[in-house]
């Protein structure tokens, strides 16, 4: 089976940098994969992607060594199993609040006896090569999101759940959980303190920690802190920001940001 070099990096305490994809374009996915990211995450929760889009985008990504990851729309075993059968090497599960919900995510990612995943890997065997059924339980990354007040109360039980490979912070929903305004890359002291607490708890439990960013500044900050899975930006975000800046420069000679919109997606 083709190894999951991203999961190997996390297990070896090495960082990885990826990008978020919310535009339904296999060409965009292929382009960003060839840019050299460690992984690309296809967003079925907030992106405009359905299963057919995700399958085509993963096929495009497979022309490179970039690892395909999918954020499913919900903690639903059917959704998780379906994208794994299509070739995802990792699943990001949103809004996980407690140990029971973490176990639900894990068991959907694992074949028996470790889980309840139904056997029918379909395209996954074309991507992975021989040995998928035997090795998948050790190569598929299960990533659960920490982004609610309930999850913050249950960090230890979530992170100690066997089979959880990483936790991933959604900064905007985390801001809601802290009664703060969502603002993308967030410098509010309470937000910063909470992000650090989540990271340190993950380190204590020996699992990887990830976080969404929209800038080089915050990406470098989080890498320096010890995050293993850092999102540098998104297809939609890069396209919109650069287009806006170039247009403003052409019209006014001003290259500064023209919007307070900090949308990651």
Model-predicted regions and their roles:
Residues 1-265:
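Expand to "…catalyze enediolate/carbanion chemistry for C-C bond making/breaking, isomerization
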């Amino acid at each position: 089976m083709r190894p999951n070099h991203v999961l190997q990096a996390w297990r070896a305490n090495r960082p990885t940098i990826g990008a978020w994809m919310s535009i339904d374009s296999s060409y965009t996915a292929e382009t960003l994969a060839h840019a050299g990211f460690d992984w690309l995450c296809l967003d079925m929760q907030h992106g405009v992607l359905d299963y057919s889009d995700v399958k085509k985008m993963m096929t495009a990504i497979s022309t490179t060594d970039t690892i395909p990851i999918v954020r499913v729309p919900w903690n639903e075993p059917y959704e998780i199993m379906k994208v794994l059968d299509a070739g995802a090497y990792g699943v990001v599960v949103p809004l996980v609040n407690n140990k029971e919900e973490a176990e639900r995510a894990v068991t959907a990612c694992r074949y028996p006896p470790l889980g309840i995943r139904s056997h029918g890997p379909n395209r996954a065997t074309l991507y992975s090569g021989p040995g998928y059924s035997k090795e998948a339980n050790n190569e598929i990354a299960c990533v659960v999101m920490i982004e609610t007040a309930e999850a913050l109360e249950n960090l230890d039980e979530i992170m100690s759940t066997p089979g959880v490979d990483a936790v991933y912070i959604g900064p905007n929903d985390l801001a809601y959980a802290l009664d703060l305004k969502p603002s993308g890359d967030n410098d509010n002291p309470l937000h910063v303190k909470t992000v650090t607490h989540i990271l340190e708890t993950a380190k204590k439990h020996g699992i990887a920690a990830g976080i969404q960013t929209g800038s080089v500044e915050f990406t470098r900050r989080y890498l320096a802190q010890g995050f293993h899975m850092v999102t540098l930006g998104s297809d939609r975000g890069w396209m919109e920001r650069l287009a806006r800046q170039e247009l403003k420069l052409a019209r006014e000679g001003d290259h500064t940001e023209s919007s307070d919109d900090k949308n990651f997606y």
